[in-house]
């Protein structure tokens, strides 16, 4: 004989199951999507001269350059937020952090400025992505506008485990050490090529193209900002497709200084000299090796 539960009990059970199912399907609070924006000036639209445009409070057109950079930064923040970012931290990364102002920055962004900061840019595992705005290519890159690797006066070349890198490559690797992918860059044609060699799927806003190191073609500022907004939003919408660039095992950072840079470099114990102008900084990982180099 099959015993049947009372109708009232059965109805209550069904209702409980329905409520449990409904509650289980309620969306949980989304994990914050925090983006770190690295900014520079040499890759900004309309900028082709260091002396005329890029030296803080010395260049006659520096204030104009600040406005161009700020416009690109704010366009990128707009795009990131539209694409799903919940927090954007903007690092004022050009020439000792003297280019951006809290008066002008996007109201929904936070600004990291001043010195000193960590050589790893205060990055940590709380970030979901890194982007570059106004970025230039590495020293020696072909037809790259105002190209250099950290210091045009002091550094000739940098290698990480024998891979030639500039600021783009080094920071892609440092971000990867924290499990954070780089998803987007704005800059000139050469900078876009550089990021895509490391992160082929990265979105790139090509705002200008060089015909030499100090000349080239540029988009008008409104067009550059519109492109940056579009590319940053697209990168954010595609975030799930990106993985961090991870350098495994022991790491050697090899730095070839310019003659001027070599003359002022003071080696310390544990750093290997390769030749008159080249030194190797070793570590168990990219962070340890980079911190050794950056401590000089």
Where do the model's predicted regions map?
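Boundary of Sec targeting at the N-terminus
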Residues: 28-30
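Active-site glycine-rich loop that binds ribose-phosphate moieties when present
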Residues: 152-178, 187-190
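Bacterial N-terminal signal peptides that target proteins for export
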Residues: 2-13
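A glycine-rich helix N-cap at a beta->alpha junction
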Residues: 107-123
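Bacterial N-terminal signal peptides
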Residues: 12-22
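Active-site rim beta-loop-alpha module in soluble metabolic enzymes
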Residues: 174-182, 186-231
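C-terminal accessory domains and tails appended to enzymatic cores
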Residues: 88, 224-296
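Alpha/propeptide regions of enzymes that mature by internal proteolysis
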Residues: 56, 60-91, 97-100, 108, ...
